């Protein structure tokens, strides 16, 4: 891809803004192509054209010119141009339709060597169609049947068909077009599934990240290499799938997909191959497995294979699997009589059936682990946000599963319309009973029986004191955590002393503080005055942003590389200094290009020069002094006859102090003159400058290491050149300079290793400030039930005042369910800041007494025991999910890490990773599910084994995150 084209093809900024603005609202259409652009380049373009009405400062000025499109910040490997993992839309990149991309490409070009990042729009959802751009393609492992060790990786869109894969594999393995082939999924060393429907898309086929596909060419005699293996694999005529060489009588293992096996398989999973029929569920209707469970496998201790960033799903499923009332409901096939296929809010019973089959497999006692591929496929059909292979939130998936199961199993076939009623002064008990009965008239399922409780919500108008009391059902409690007030930042301080390396510091600053707070904190550690600091965000060898002191720290994300420069506001003699950004560039010879033809490298500089001495010579010397630590000066015999000889500073259009500022409407015009040298002209700068020019004239000087260019703020486009006649340069605080090196000079005189070297301050090695002591779960509950005032953007409409009011609002708990799910709200974010609260929340493993938080004083005692925990390790958007769960059959705790299951002890469970807690209510009397459906809190629960004896030989487990 060529670099930027000439500016004559580029319309004025207003036209650009209008044309792109109209295109940015383009609706996503299936199969359409959209392009990724690095958000930093796009933000620079928006500033240049004044795209946002609130950011119109210096619109169209040359220093804001974005230069050619540069997506290098999105690549983990610049050679292969592979996208970094976990990129976030709008934060890391923007998506533009093809027409918008073509316009930008025509106007600005693209950095040399970069290919456009083009992606297709794919459609998700079975009933409600949802289009989205498929940013991350699916990686498949491809091999040929005769040489399974030669595996090639290829990327495909989920909208591609199986035929597309076959065509690519024929090409890769040199298989003639006339030769018949078959495609197989390879799940384990000996388990295969034939992909016979070539018109199926990858999404429909349920292929997942890293899936191995095998292409099998037909023998010349018309037989197939795998045919003999298939005939040996099974004797069951109704089943094309086996995971063992011996037949199985289990109808659960009989599915429609064609699978064969190469021999014995002890741990393979039937979940790989469950066929999905568009006209029905595609799952077996019962669980009457005749094959006895293994005596060595405890039912329920079944790991779940990671299908590609699906640890979040595995964690949620393990917690649900160990929720005894729900699991027993499915194992006893009670769900079959309650499936509601006609519920418009449901999923035709398919989520319930998929979940039932998975639970039966996990509790069969036959498998140490299974791959929940079909369950994930079913979830993705109805909830497109979970259909890909990017990390998701276990609590969000949990909420979808519970809601999906509820609607699929809702016993109410026709929901009545019910008018909501306010309390109007009636007793709470009356209003609560009415609200719960109305809820049950529309919602009656095992999920309601097991997980639903009742909130009391009280709103008070600040003007008329109107009190509104309502009661609403809930399925889980989302509890806020006390917010931390500080944040830890790691920054680099670049001292003014050129012989000092940059120093990395770790500082504590207010979470919602300003840049000035960062400078003050850094000043205390370094001894450098805060007023002499300039805070910058360095990205791709340039300043992405130079911050003002009053800007918020919320603009700085953990991903940013923050460099703080010590600058001189005044010189030694007290005169005012100007501080200029300076970039390093290696000049390339590109005479036909309107762009700079230069590549940025190294760490950018902020160079301070006295205004009254701002000549080219003094600027050159100031830069040389600033970089003296990592450059070598030329040898004495490397002289030039004059420091200002033509070509030394590629001067053309001079910039003089006192001249009227020139309008740079066409950068190309300036570019055409870069190689010319302007005459010295009239000396109107005074005797001092004339004398200075005479002083250096004729003196032998060292060979110049670099030349100067006045560039845009990205360093990607030349704007002007600098005067070579000793007169003062007309530069201001918005000017940006580049020092251009040729390749040979850079390799001879520039020390790359030393230029990147830095020191670490003691703050980096010292233990971080001890965090606040662990928070008790009761503190989170108290915070949840604390009265608050509604925000101005979230007011309440007062029926008495007839207007919206910032009322006070208070939540209370009225009744609690059998299974209490507690979601600890660890993730918080705003437009600029995304954070995870890693506070340790101390929650009881046994005897959590919630009675004191229930405002219904006539209610029974609410005492709970912990049964499962979903853990999250890492930061927001990345990391790894696991689970702790208590097996109901032996009363022991286990740690579930995808396919791995290991014994755990109670003292391992309470950690800062705990994210979702599952509690089961203690019941005074044993009651079965026949009591389900009564008022929450008034019924008993299913009494299960609750052995709390010693764990026995607990195993320490070291998590290996993916």
Swiss-Prot record:
Which residues of this protein are catalytic?
A: 311 (nucleophile), 880 (proton acceptor)
User: Coordinates of motif Nuclear export signal in the sequence?
Assistant: 133-141
Start and end residues of each stretch annotated as Regulates ubiquitin dissociation: 384-386
Segments of skewed composition (Low complexity): 928-937
Q: Which residues bind Zn(2+)?
A: 461, 464, 798, 801
Per the database record, which ranges form the DUSP domain? 11-122
Bias class Acidic residues marks the residues at: 657-666, 952-962
Q: What does this protein do?
A: Deubiquitinating enzyme that removes conjugated ubiquitin from target proteins. Deubiquitinates PDPK1. Deubiquitinates TRIM21. Deubiquitinates receptor ADORA2A which increases the amount of functional receptor at the cell surface. Deubiquitinates HAS2. Deubiquitinates RHEB in response to EGF signaling, promoting mTORC1 signaling. May regulate mRNA splicing through deubiquitination of the U4 spliceosomal protein PRPF3. This may prevent its recognition by the U5 component PRPF8 thereby destabilizing interactions within the U4/U6.U5 snRNP.
Q: What is the lineage of its organism?
A: Eukaryota, Metazoa, Chordata, Craniata, Vertebrata
The name under which this protein is listed is: Ubiquitin carboxyl-terminal hydrolase 4
**Catalysed reactions, semicolon-separated:** Thiol-dependent hydrolysis of ester, thioester, amide, peptide and isopeptide bonds formed by the C-terminal Gly of ubiquitin (a 76-residue protein attached to proteins as an intracellular targeting signal)
Question: Region Interacts with DUSP and ubiquitin-like 1 domains and is required for USP4 activation: which residues?
Answer: 485-774
> Region (Required for USP4 activation by providing conformational flexibility between the DUSP and catalytic domains) spans which residues?
229-295
What InterPro entries does this protein's entry cite?
A: DUSP-like_sf, Papain-like_cys_pep_sf, Pept_C19_DUSP, Peptidase_C19_UCH, Ub_carboxyl-term_hydrolase, Ub_USP-typ, USP_CS, USP_dom
User: What does the PTM comment of the record read?
Assistant: Phosphorylated at Ser-445 by PKB/AKT1 in response to EGF stimulus, promoting its ability deubiquitinate RHEB.
Record comment regarding domains = The DUSP and ubiquitin-like 1 domains promote ubiquitin release and thus enhance USB4 catalytic activity. However, these domains do not bind ubiquitin.
